[in-house]
Amino acid sequence: SDADGQVIDRALVLTFEGPNSFTGEDTVELHLHGSIAVVRAVLALLSGFDGTRLAEPGEFTRRAMENGKLDLTQVEGLGDLIEAETEAQRKQALRVLSGHLGQKVDIWREKLIRAAALLEVTIDFADEDVPVDVSPEVTELLNAVNADILAEIAGTHTAERIRTGFEVAIIGRPNAGKSTLLNALAGRDAAITSAVAGTTRDVIEVRMDLGGLPVTLLDTAGLREGADEVESIGIDRAKTRGEQADLRVFLSEEGEELPVAAVADDIVLRPKADLRASADKAISGVTGQGVPQLIERIQAILGARSLNVGLATHERHRVALQKSAEGLAAAMLVLDHGPDQYDIASEELRHSIRALEALVGRIDVENLLDVIFSSFCLGK
């Protein structure tokens, strides 16, 4: 009710007692009939209480992290889940939100701390006879962590691509039917089609969900010599994006030199199957001939790459893992030089441990938190 005793809404009130709530604090939720007038009236009433204010974007999640309910990777997983557009993105975000990456990091960190402690014991008793040679156990610990971290780093590219989208570039000479094929794949007129060569002068992007995988199709400018200045700019961009794409679909005639070097898994097709006597390895965006088969091939290729995807889904994760791996490699290198170098090895391990702690948000993250939480809605 408002200050005059008039009913504002008939609502559901839920209470969550800390530390078992999402934030770890005592929380009350009002489930209202969500009209603008009702929400405005309730907010006006609540603002009259001392000590109340609107939450900052992501503040509830930030409190959950500060209260130990989530680590930083889980916070990012929650953000990715909110933004997920495809089934692969949803599943990946849930894996990160569930804390699997943080659990891995905790195991690695504990092993590195154990290794550093063993080295420190040897350093502390350098002038005395240490009854046990710690180097075999330290080496075993470091080798195990190193293998795990390198394996995780190897899967970061695909993990990042699932989050942001795989790029598939359609490449060929001008008027080869690239824009028509893009429109056929997208199911709409996303690119201008014309019989005039060079109609597409910039890279056109279309986001799609292919079998649950996020894919951005790139319609590139036709690659040819002797183009005018404006078209040449588009051609340069097309070459760059084509080389950087995760997969390339070439529309090329038999014996024609490919304008961008093909790599494993790239697809080469003959354009305009509707105008050919033989449709072998040909495709037509006009009639749709070969389009379903192309979609199946793209799904199969990208799907196979996604089978062993890692949990490090952000560039920040990859950078932290690489820093940790660098410290670990340096420690392993000096460890071979004997006990005289154990102090250096121990220091390198501390660098490696700090990188892992930054990954899960234990240290050096204040500036980063402001950026991450600013992308959350008020209700999170």
Question: Model-found features: residue ranges?
Answer:
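Generic enzyme active-site microenvironment
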Residues: 217, 251, 269
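Flexible glycine-/small-residue-rich
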Residues: 15, 32-34, 170-174, 219
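Switch I (G2) and immediately adjacent beta-strands of P-loop GTPase domains
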Residues: 1-9, 13-17, 198-226, 247
